[in-house]
Curated annotation (Swiss-Prot):
Record organism: Influenza A virus (strain A/Silky Chicken/Hong Kong/SF189/2001 H5N1 genotype A)
A Pfam family per the record: Flu_PB1
Entry similarity comment: Belongs to the influenza viruses polymerase PB1 family.
GN (gene name): PB1
Stretches the record annotates as Promoter-binding site: 249-256
Catalytic reactions on record: RNA(n) + a ribonucleoside 5'-triphosphate = RNA(n+1) + diphosphate
InterPro entries cross-referenced by the UniProt entry: RNA-dir_pol_NSvirus, RNA_pol_PB1_influenza
Protein name, UniProt field: RNA-directed RNA polymerase catalytic subunit
Listed Polar residues bias regions: 55-64
EC number, UniProt record: 2.7.7.48
Cystine residue pairs: none
Origin superkingdom: Viruses
Chain span(s) of sequence motif Nuclear localization signal: 187-195, 203-216
GO molecular function: nucleotide binding; RNA binding; RNA-directed RNA polymerase activity
Sequence segments annotated as region (Disordered): 50-82
Length: 757
């Protein structure tokens, strides 16, 4: 019998059917090869949007710079970056008028944070441009390298451990006539292998000292390295994203802290909150507009899209905003906050790896590094690349392109949101002074605009006014991509609103399944994801139960741990059957040891080990939770771990799951091949750094609220902490006199060794 699919939806409200429209199965596209072309696109496009600005030359670096601020007012609908300073300042003033004291209070909050933040804040984050090696590194390593080089160049403020003191060093470093850095290089030589008697290439890593003059150092300090954004769905073309170096990061962090504090106080801001909190905040704005429009007014909503938000923003505008926001604050605070936008006005974009050429006939491949693009003969390139290079050439210095206008992706999300909200704020009747008025939501470059008016003409006039007001501050609403509807149905940051936000459960589908970390973590993450979706995404009990059964099935196939009494034959079945037969209480076996599944939708919050603990045979308990088990390299496990799961759309999400350490919490060993490459030195540095940080955390666990303050080095801090703790333990009788004496002796020895060094 044929089933008419429409019948499935007879009882379902239309908005619940959104989960059936899910287009994203399979893997998202990843980029391969070089991002140089995408970066050149970004640089060229950004300059095109601001082409009527004024050209100047940076006196320190010699970089040509384009300044579109207060440029010509737009005469057409083309996107442009000609923001008018006075308009931006006026929008800020009105924002403050509608929210009395907002800037003042946010400044006070930020000032407190600035004085307390420690430099290790900069170790958060993933890949960071490491200016010492001129390539990307993990954030912690890049910071360590920067501090090491600052120290060897006589800059020592950072040793106090406060971020603000590190930033003082950054400022001083820019005044120095030269900086001496240590870089890594590879030597390759052909040697005969004693065992196989074949010729092999041996690589050795050298470190060499190099002096950078002021100009070269400044260029590196102002450089953003670029990469291609991966895993973007729904786009044919890839695009470039940027990662700044350590000199810029600290300043950006403080600006974003201030902007975050302002956004928290603005009802139209979709940042910095997320999830249900965000939905509640946004639903309030919609409710307000709908209540007011009940009988007399029409209300329409635009699901908005802005053209190239980042490329039309301008750091000089951000400087104007910060100058206004902090106008009554102490001089030092205003200076610290204005440095980030100033650095961005002088930024350089690194063009990435360059181009790869291959000759089919001679089987040769050669890399043309970005540094060579300035003077290589263009006949080797195809038409489109040739155009790009010709356009970008006047901007090139040492393989980086001068990029003064525009704001590379993801840098000032909070501050640009403040700018967007300030325009939404102008929609109040007391500002429009007419019959139409507007309000809306803003989250970075995404917006939704709600316009109310007595008739259609009024709605049209309101939209036009909003559009033009945006133009004045460098925001370009795309008329092609924005969509208007009766209020009650719109989309904002992938939330779909139809008389309330609709749970689009299918967006979470890719995060169901086995993560592939290890047996213990995967089980925990799997049930946590199902639990979270029951709480947040209208995942009903029947569907959740089914999801759970599918997950267990998936898990058993992944780890080949089918029940001990199953007929399925795998590599592990012989061992698991043996375990099953010799276990008295079979219900106590973990699923990964061939046990039954005891999970149902009521107990998803309990880790499996805890769920089954009372049911386990004693010797099984002993084997399972044995820290001395020689086959497991144990990482110390906090009570809660974080896993990264990928929803279909939007950024990777961090999911907290309960981590119970068992012999199933193994960590795969690092691939050996890295140890023979140039990365080896870096890997050792990183492990060293990790060990130090772990040791430090032992002395100052995150739970202890007081961080060491005003002590000059980590070692001294740890020694003094050890002495205090030992004294407390001795006086309360927790340790014996001999132990106390031994601890004191070790502390003195450490101090003595430091003095000799």
């Amino acid at each position: 019998m044929d089933v008419n699919p429409t019948l499935l939806f007879l009882k379902v409200p239309a908005q619940n059917a959104i989960s059936t429209t899910f287009p994203y199965t399979g893997d998202p596209p990843y980029s391969h090869g070089t991002g140089t072309g995408y970066t050149m696109d970004t640089v060229n496009r950004t300059h095109q949007y601001s082409e009527k600005g004024k050209w100047t030359t940076n006196t320190e670096t010699g970089a040509p710079q384009l300044n579109p601020i207060d440029g010509p007012l737009p005469e057409d609908n083309e996107p442009s970056g000609y923001a008018q300073t006075d308009c931006v300042l006026e929008a800020m003033a009105f924002l403050e008028e509608s929210h009395p004291g907002i800037f003042e209070n946010s400044c006070l909050e930020t000032m407190e944070i600035v004085q307390q933040t420690r430099v290790d804040k900069l170790t958060q984050g993933r890949q960071t441009y490491d200016w010492t090696l001129n390539r990307n590194q993990p954030a912690a390593t890049a910071l360590a390298n920067t501090i090491e080089i600052f120290r060897s160049n006589g800059l020592t403020a950072n040793e106090s451990g406060r971020l603000i003191d590190f930033l003082k060093d950054v400022m001083e470093s820019m005044d120095k006539e030269e900086m001496e850095i240590t870089t890594h290089f590879q030597r390759k030589r052909r040697v005969r292998d004693n065992m196989t008697k074949k010729m092999v290439t041996q690589r050795t890593i050298g470190k060499k000292k190099q002096r950078l003059n002021k100009k070269s150092y400044l260029i590196r300090a102002l450089t953003l390295n670029t990469m291609t954004k991966d895993a973007e769905r729904g786009k044919l073309k890839r695009r470039a994203i940027a990662t700044p170096g350590m000199q810029i990061r600290g300043f950006v962090y403080f600006v974003e802290t201030l902007a975050r504090s302002i956004c928290e106080k603005l009802e139209q801001s979709g940042l910095p909150v997320g999830g249900n909190e965000k939905k509640a905040k946004l639903a309030n704005v919609v409710r307000k507009m709908m209540t007011n429009s009940q009988d007399t007014e029409l209300s329409f909503t635009i699901t908005g899209d802005n053209t190239k938000w980042n490329e039309n923003q301008n750091p000089r505008m951000f400087l104007a905003m910060i100058t206004y926001i902090t106008r009554n604050q102490p001089e030092w605070f205003r200076n610290v906050l204005s440095i980030a936008p100033i650095m961005f006005s002088n930024k350089m974009a690194r063009l990435g790896k360059g181009y790869m050429f291959e000759s089919k006939s001679m089987k040769l491949r050669t890399q043309i590094p970005a540094e060579m693009l300035a003077n290589i003969d263009l006949k080797y390139f195809n038409e489109s690349t040739r155009k790009k290079i010709e356009k970008i050439r006047p901007l090139l210095i040492d393989g980086t392109a001068s990029l003064s206008p525009g704001m590379m992706m993801g840098m000032f999300n909070m501050l640009s949101t403040v700018l967007g909200v300030s325009i939404l704020n102008l929609g109040q009747k007391r500002y429009t002074k007419t019959t139409y008025w507007w309000d809306g939501l803003q989250s970075s470059d995404d917006f939704a605009l709600i316009v109310n008016a007595p008739n259609h003409e009024g709605i049209q006039a309101g939209v036009d006014r909003f559009y033009r007001t945006c133009k004045l501050v460098g925001i370009n609403m795309s008329k092609k991509k924005s969509y208007i509807n009766r209020t009650g149905t719109f989309e904002f940051t992938s939330f779909f609103y139809r008389y309330g936000f609709v749970a689009n459960f299918s967006m979470e589908l890719p995060s169901f399944g086995v993560s592939g970390i290890n047996e213990s973590a995967d089980m925990s993450i799997g049930v946590t994801v199902i639990k979270n979706n029951m709480i947040n995404n209208d995942l009903g009990p029947a569907t959740a139960q089914m999801a759970l059964q599918l997950f267990i099935k998936d898990y058993r196939y992944t780890y080949r741990c089918h029940r001990g009494d199953t007929q399925i034959q795998t590599r592990r079945s012989f061992e698991l059957k043996k375990l099953w037969e010799q276990t008295r209480s079979k219900a106590g076996l973990l699923v990964s040891d061939g046990g039954p599944n005891l999970y149902n939708i009521r107990n998803l919050h309990i880790p499996e080990v805890c769920l089954k603990w009372e049911l386990m045979d004693e010797d099984y308990q002993g084997r399972l939770c044995n820290p001395l088990n020689p086959f497991v390299s144990h990482k110390e496990i906090e009570s809660v771990n974080n896993a990264v799961v990928m929803p279909a759309h939007g950024p990777a999400k961090s999911v907290e799951y309960d981590a119970v350490a068992t012999t199933h919490s193994w960590i795969p060993k690092r691939n050996r091949s890295i140890l023979n490459t140039s990365q080896r030195g870096i890997l050792e540095d990183e492990q060293m750094y990790q060990k130090c940080c772990n040791l430090f955390e032992k002395f100052f666990p995150s739970s202890s609220y007081r961080r060491p303050v005003g002590i000059s080095s980590m070692v001294e801090a740890m020694v003094s902490r050890a002495r205090i703790d030992a004294r407390i333990d001795f006086e309360s009788g927790r340790i014996k006199k001999e132990e106390f004496a031994e601890i004191m002796k070790i502390c003195s020895t450490i101090e003595e060794l430091r003095r000799q060094k």
